[in-house]
Structures are given as structure tokens and as C-alpha cells.
Amino acid sequence: MGNSCRGSFKDKIYEGNHSRPEENSKSTTTTVSSVHSPTTDQDFSKQNTNPALVIPVKEPIMRRNVDNQSYYVLGHKTPNIRDLYTLSRKLGQGQFGTTYLCTDIATGVDYACKSISKRKLISKEDVEDVRREIQIMHHLAGHKNIVTIKGAYEDPLYVHIVMELCAGGELFDRIIHRGHYSERKAAELTKIIVGVVEACHSLGVMHRDLKPENFLLVNKDDDFSLKAIDFGLSVFFKPGQIFKDVVGSPYYVAPEVLLKHYGPEADVWTAGVILYILLSGVPPFWAETQQGIFDAVLKGYIDFDTDPWPVISDSAKDLIRKMLCSSPSERLTAHEVLRHPWICENGVAPDRALDPAVLSRLKQFSAMNKLKKMALKVIAESLSEEEIAGLRAMFEAMDTDNSGAITFDELKAGLRRYGSTLKDTEIRDLMEAADVDNSGTIDYSEFIAATIHLNKLEREEHLVSAFQYFDKDGSGYITIDELQQSCIEHGMTDVFLEDIIKEVDQDNDGRIDYEEFVAMMQKGNAGVGRRTMKNSLNISMRDV
């Protein structure tokens, strides 16, 4: 596993323009409802007197039949990347583009190349986001735990960011592979993560999307080769500057972000969530739905009673409490975290091995969504023409130029005709989620696969069909061997099969029966931090 091209929408929450601080609002605006929140101990009423968030309307810059060669995202012409590098296998894929292994032709040194589709950049803010990401990577260059940018290049179709190759895989994968680790090791990893936060803040940068997936190892055998990647949501900030756009990932988002009044303190909260997961294997704020997670974050209750917390040191729990303090002004700064006794050099974090159950939970935490995603694909592929006739009609109605693909503008206009009240950012989120091949448009097959979340998933006959696909021998149970065969068929080789079985298998017989399968499919998709067609599209499909 190498550098991954993380989706800017798949793993994020979007409420408004994610690149604009409060004081930079433009005169042309639209009104969006505030995030629902219960009463909390911390009073933010003075900071949030308006009942609604006012955000700028994005000005589109990309249109069908526009010659993309006539403008530069980077603002200037660059050398042809293929004159300097050889691009080879794909390392990862996200909503904006794909990351490839690339080799410097002159030196033979391997790098990672994140290629961003210019067709995805549908507004001026999108272009500014890419420019800012590159600027921030250059600005932070030189820190030993931040991925190093080599250069940025542009051609008629893509912006290419060449950066240091992190071939050691994700932080969590390394922990799982190790089989056990101690509080001391968790303290060492936390020191690296918070050190990145301190470096960013000292240089006037707020990361805004810290999470374990955004930390990769350069060398799988060296835990200290950890590097922060993906600065796509990062912004420059000035002391005292207030931001109110809701960005991040559900498990890791700070309460003040949900309340749309925040600054760099939110990064410390997120680092505290990561620390809690490192020590327990589960996030501190948990629910079956995204709104439930948000409510838990705003409530702020931290569980230190259930296993393994009774055997975790008091010093570790003290640090977590101070990092997950609901009041940003009372929360530790990154510098103060690094001075805490549990984390500092020769600190008090014990070297006692943590409960193996923590590792098990980590594996289960990462495995569930892979099976669910595979099952959704199976359902999409099993639908008959009769079942999708209504969806085909909807697709054809949206595809106004009969090109066989829906553009952003066509999707926006089509949803309006069907009664949708979604914001532009939410519509863009849906489009990015549905556009599997990153073409900048949604083709027919992608549209069907996405819209089955609306009106097909809960149909029992389709759940039966999907279950039968996995139940190869028709025994009424999905076994680990059958699951392995299905994973191979779908090219999913990095799945922890035993943990999928364990998580779904409610009666502990080592198999998944139909009722357990249905329960998994109907369970809130809590591990995915993006809006989906199912939970975002505010239209009725009964007559479609």
C-alpha cells in the first residue's frame, strides 16, 4: 500500500463552502439550515446568534465543450510530467482523481503522483482548493513527519502532484500487523501526530481532516517514518480568525465545527479522538447514524468505564480528557499536549501490552464497510431491466443532451425538477460519490449503482439475491471460504475475513445467516463520512 488519493467528498462532511472563513463571505448568497444539535454544557449562543448559515454561491468555471487547455489551474504552464516521470500502477483512488506510482526518469527514484481530474474542478473554489493544497504542502515542506512535495504539473486534463512515496501502508494496518502494542508505543505515535499539528499551527495552517487513514508509513518496518498526507481540506489561518464551514469526518469532528464557530483548536480535538482509538480500538463518540455521531460529539460524554479502560493509566485518561474538552478555550494546545507527562520523553506511559481485544476491534472497525460495499455492488448488478426502468427514465430525463452521461449542471437541474432542496455542495457530494471512474460525469451504470440506495436496498428480494451470491453452496449460511471467494471475485484482497464474520455473526456460530446479513445491510453506515444518495437526496422515488 502506498500513498492513497483520498476522496475529498467520500470521507468528509460538507455544510457550506469548505474553503471560506467567516469574514470572507461574498455578497451573493444562499441560505442553508444549521446542523441539528442538542443542548450542550458549553454555551456557544453568543457565537451563533444567526439561525442559518449564509454561504457563497459557487461560480461554475467548467462546462461541457469548453476547451480545458485554455486555462491553467496552477496559473502557469508547466513541463510535461511524462518528460520527467514514468507513471505506472495505481496506488489509490479518490473522488477528485487517482494516485499512481511514478518514477523519476533521470534518477530512478520512486514517488507517488496524485493526478486530479480538471473536469472535477467545477467551480472557482475547487480550483482555489487545489492551488491552496499545493501551496500548503510547499509551505510545510521540511518537517520529517509531513509528506514532501516534489513538484506540481499540469496538462489539458489533469493536475499532477508528485510527492514522497509512502510504501509502508496505513498506521492502523501497521498496528494490526504488529499484533500487540503498549501505551508507550501509543504515546510515541501520538507524539508524532500532535507534532504535525503543532508544526501546522505554528506555520498558520489548520489541517481540518486528521484521521488515521491520513497517516502513512514510508517504511513498514519503521514506525517513526510516519507521514501526514492529504492537505486537501487544510487552510491558512490568522490568530483569532473564525471558520464556520463544517468539514471533516464524522468520528473525528470537533463540537465547535458542528456549531460552525471554530479555529485550530479543532485539530487537537481530532488528535484526541485518534488517541482514544489507539488505546481502545473504538471511537469515543459512536452511533448507528451520522446524526447520532454528531449528537454524541456535542454531548461530549467519554466512556472510561468499559474494557480496556480500567487497566489504562490515569495519565493517559487525563490527557484524553484535556484534548477532548468541549470548550475550545480550555482545551490543551498542541504544544501543551507535547508537554504532558504521558507523552513527553521518558514519560509515564507504561510499557504494558494492551488488551488484544483492542486490536480485534481495530480490525473489525476497518472491515465492515468493505463487505457492505461489495454487497451493494452485487445488488446493483442483479437488478433486472424491469426493476430499473423507472431509474432509467430518471437518468434519461436528466441527461438532457443525450450524451449518455450526466454532468454536474444536468444533475443539479434534474434534482430541482424532482423537488430536491439540496445545496450545490451536497449535490456535488452526491456526484462525486456516484462517479466511480472519476470521469467527471455519471454514466448510466454509475447512476443505477448509486440510486439503488434510494429505493432498492431495503427491498427484501434484492437482499435475498445478494445473500445468495455470497452463499455459494446454498446452505443458508455465508462461510469464511465463501466470503474469501467473493472477495477474490471483486478484487478485494486486503479484507480481514475472520473479523467480518465475527462482527456480523450475532449468534457466534462462525457463519453469517440471512438475518445477520440483513441486520448488517440495514445498520447505519457509520464508517463512511460522506453523504450518500440514500441519506441526502430529498426526493420521493415512489413514482419513478
From Swiss-Prot:
It is found in: Cell membrane; Nucleus. Residues 8-25 have a biased composition (Basic and acidic residues). Pfam families: EF-hand_7 (PF13499), Pkinase (PF00069). Residues 349-379 are annotated as: Autoinhibitory domain. Residues 26-40 have a biased composition (Low complexity). GO terms for biological process: abscisic acid-activated signaling pathway; protein autophosphorylation; regulation of anion channel activity; regulation of stomatal movement; regulation of stomatal opening. A lipid is attached at G2 (N-myristoyl glycine). Ca(2+) 1 binds at D399, D401, S403, E410. Residues 1-47 are annotated as: Disordered. The keyword Metal-binding applies. Residues 386-421, 422-457, 458-493, 497-527 form the EF-hand domain. Coiled coil: none annotated. GO terms for molecular function: ATP binding; calcium ion binding; calcium-dependent protein serine/threonine kinase activity; protein serine kinase activity; protein serine/threonine kinase activity. Keywords: ATP-binding, Calcium, Cell membrane, Kinase, Lipoprotein, Membrane, Metal-binding, Myristate, Nucleotide-binding, Nucleus, Phosphoprotein, Repeat, Serine/threonine-protein kinase, Transferase. Ca(2+) 3 binds at D471, D473, S475, Y477, E482. Expressed in both guard cells and mesophyll cells. Expressed in the shoot apical meristem. The active site is at D209 (proton acceptor). Ca(2+) 2 binds at D435, D437, S439, T441, E446. InterPro entries: CDPK_Ser/Thr_kinases, EF-hand-dom_pair, EF_Hand_1_Ca_BS, EF_hand_dom, Kinase-like_dom_sf, Prot_kinase_dom, Protein_kinase_ATP_BS, Ser/Thr_kinase_AS. It is a lipid-anchor. There are 3 contiguous domains conserved in the CDPK subfamily: a kinase domain, an autoinhibitory (junction) domain and a calmodulin-like domain. The autoinhibitory domain (349-379) inactivates kinase activity under calcium-free conditions. Belongs to the protein kinase superfamily. Ser/Thr protein kinase family. CDPK subfamily. Interacts with SLAC1. Interacts with FD. May play a role in signal transduction pathways that involve calcium as a second messenger. Functions in abscisic acid (ABA) regulation of guard cell S-type anion- and Ca(2+)-permeable channels and stomatal closure. Phosphorylates FD. This is Calcium-dependent protein kinase 6.
